[in-house]
Amino acid sequence: MTQRALWLRDPLGILADGAERGIVVSGDTIVELVPDGAAPATPDVAVFDASRHTVLPGLINTHHHFYQTLTRASPAALDRTLFPWLQALYPIWGRLTPDSLDAAATVAMAELLLSGCTTTTDHHYVFPAGLESAIDTEVDVARRLGIRVVLTRGSMNLSQRDGGLPPDSVVQDADTILADSERLIARYHDTSSAAMVQVALAPCSPFSVTRSLMTATAALAERTGVRLHTHLAETADEEAFCLEKMGCRPLDYLEQCGWLGDRTWLAHGIHFNSAEIARMAKAGTCVTHCPCSNQILASGNCLVCEMEQAGMAVGLGVDGSASNNASNLMQEVRAAFLLQRARYGVEKVSHRDALRWATEGSAACIGRSADVGRIAVGMQADLALFTLDELRFSGALDPIAALVVCGAHRADRVMVGGRWVVEDGTIPGLDIAALVRRHNVAAKSLHAE
């Protein structure tokens, strides 16, 4: 029996033009926008009363480290800048197990879903002995929860003994990394418009990966048609490292390795000059802004307005839950709005800009602008519905603005590919209390030694 199309009727607010009376979803796709004063042209629709809901395109998280939910507010890492912060946490992350990663990934993806996120990336680059199937574990969790993912096969092969930052216990050799990258692409990477799982390649950073691995990874991505991701220009320390070890600035090094192109998106992108921004724009390279992490680690502030003015796409990412200490993308939207409004002023940054970074901008980062990030006919039915019933929203008159300026943090309903994965503020089938208990045990175990 064919499932009836669903009309999300008369939303309180919706981030789409010409959809004042809602949208119609059939299967996994948006098939109709219903304008003011009209009814659906689609026959025999089921109805969801959206009159209490403000409807957004599903938010898209373009930088994260799921495993780091296990080291939130870790005493060893508080009040540190990036390099000392990493050095404090690498030994703890070296104790990760498949079970602890499963718990960490479940917490991260559940928190993202509950914040209105329908697509997330993850950058997993720590592979201690026994954790060789980390990405497979993340795929399993994503499928259980129903969230759309782009999982990046991270890597580190430049350890402390070779002049890098990480200890030997969390790095792998280049041959192992490249072989596993090929395996994951062959097994999981889906190129269809409805893809629920995709794979990208993501050497961690210039200070943890050899030049040869960076170059080989770019060649593999070109051959297999997948995207590239890495941290770049996050801190002044990174710039100094590149100048000392490579004899050039981080973006120059990236270009030398074959990475400056339209399949690449970069995390952070704080310490770029105007000429570098112009080069990235010309190449089609995108940047993910991570405001909470950048503030907590005092790394600096991404030049989002200069980037967009140059023609670059800017996305949004929560970054790791040990630097951000949260996996809430709606809160990240507000953080980006406040941080960039303070920098650029009221005429250059609005709440809609911040929402655009988390939707259309993020979709561009992962190469999926044709599928997700907008409410439009033909797009995947990925939607986040928020109510304004909480005390924090009382008196709010603009429902779209209220989500950002009043601090929305939890969606009431979330749809991914036409399927409800959050209902009444909960994830069906997921025992949150049991998950928290399991996750806390795993976190304490990592810190016990």
Where does each model-flagged region fall?
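Histidine/acidic-residue-rich catalytic or RNA/ligand-binding cores of hydrolases
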Residues: 73, 236-248, 276-281, 298-308, ...
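His/Asp/Glu-enriched, well-ordered alpha-helical/loop segment
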Residues: 256-263, 305-390, 405-406
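Active-site microenvironment of metallo-dependent hydrolases
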Residues: 1-21, 25-27, 31, 359-449
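Divalent metal-coordination and catalytic microenvironments
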Residues: 11, 23, 28, 52, ...
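Metal-coordinating catalytic core of metallo-dependent amide/deamination hydrolases
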Residues: 130-269
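Long hydrophobic segments that form regular secondary structure
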Residues: 272, 276-284, 291-296
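Alpha-helical scaffold segments that flank or form the walls of functional sites
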Residues: 73-123, 128-148, 179-193, 440-448
